[in-house]
Curated annotation (Swiss-Prot):
It comes from the Bacteria. The gene is rpsH. Coiled coil: none annotated. One of its GO terms (cellular component) is ribosome. Keywords: Ribonucleoprotein, Ribosomal protein, RNA-binding, rRNA-binding. GO terms for molecular function: rRNA binding; structural constituent of ribosome. Belongs to the universal ribosomal protein uS8 family. This is Small ribosomal subunit protein uS8. HAMAP family: Ribosomal_uS8_B. InterPro entries: Ribosomal_uS8 (IPR000630), Ribosomal_uS8_CS (IPR047863), Ribosomal_uS8_sf (IPR035987). Part of the 30S ribosomal subunit. Contacts proteins S5 and S12. GO terms for biological process: translation. It comes from Limosilactobacillus fermentum (strain NBRC 3956 / LMG 18251) (Lactobacillus fermentum).
Length: 132
C-alpha cells in the first residue's frame, strides 16, 4: 500500500519514539526528510542524524535528545500543510510558534528553512510543520 503523506509518517515516527523514550528511530529517506532532520539537529531538538544506504531509497536514522532527568526536548510536533489541504504563507505572514519558543519548518524557493530564516530572507512558502 502506498503512503499518502510520507512527511506526516516521518514526524509521527519521531513523536512516537520520543513518547516511548527510544534512543533512535528509523524511516525511509527522502530529500525533504533529510532537510527536516538537519533543521531539527541545527535547532537542538535531536542529538544526531545518520543516513544508511540500502541499495533502495536509503534509511534515515534520527537519534533523539533528552534532558538530564530524561525529560523530552521535543514537546510537540504538528504537521500543518497536508496533501488534502496545503498551507502557504507570504513573506510578511510567516508564523511564530509559541511566541518564538518553537520553530516552524517552511519549504521555500530557497529550500527547507525555519521560520526565523524565512523571515530574515523575506521569503514565504509552504508551512510543513510546527515543532516545540
Amino acid at each position: 500500500m502506498s503512503m499518502s503523506d510520507p512527511i506526516a509518517d516521518f514526524l509521527t515516527r519521531i513523536r512516537n519514539a520520543n513518547m516511548a523514550h527510544h534512543d533512535s528511530v528509523e524511516a525511509p529517506a527522502s530529500k525533504m526528510k533529510k532537510d527536516i532532520a538537519e533543521i531539527l539537529k541545527q535547532e537542538g531538538f535531536i542529538r544526531d542524524v545518520e543516513y544508511v544506504e540500502d541499495n533502495k531509497q536509503g534509511i534515515i536514522r534520527v537519534f533523539l535528545k533528552y534532558g538530564q532527568d530524561g525529560e523530552r526536548v521535543i514537546s510537540g510536533l504538528k504537521r500543518i500543510s497536508k496533501p488534502g489541504l496545503r498551507s502557504y504563507v507570504k513573506a510578511d505572514a510567516v508564523p511564530k510558534v509559541l511566541n518564538g519558543l518553537g520553530i516552524a519548518i517552511i519549504s521555500t524557493s530557497n529550500g527547507v528553512v525555519t521560520d526565523k530564516v524565512a523571515r530574515a530572507k523575506k521569503v514565504g512558502g509552504e508551512v510543513v510543520a510546527y515543532i516545540w
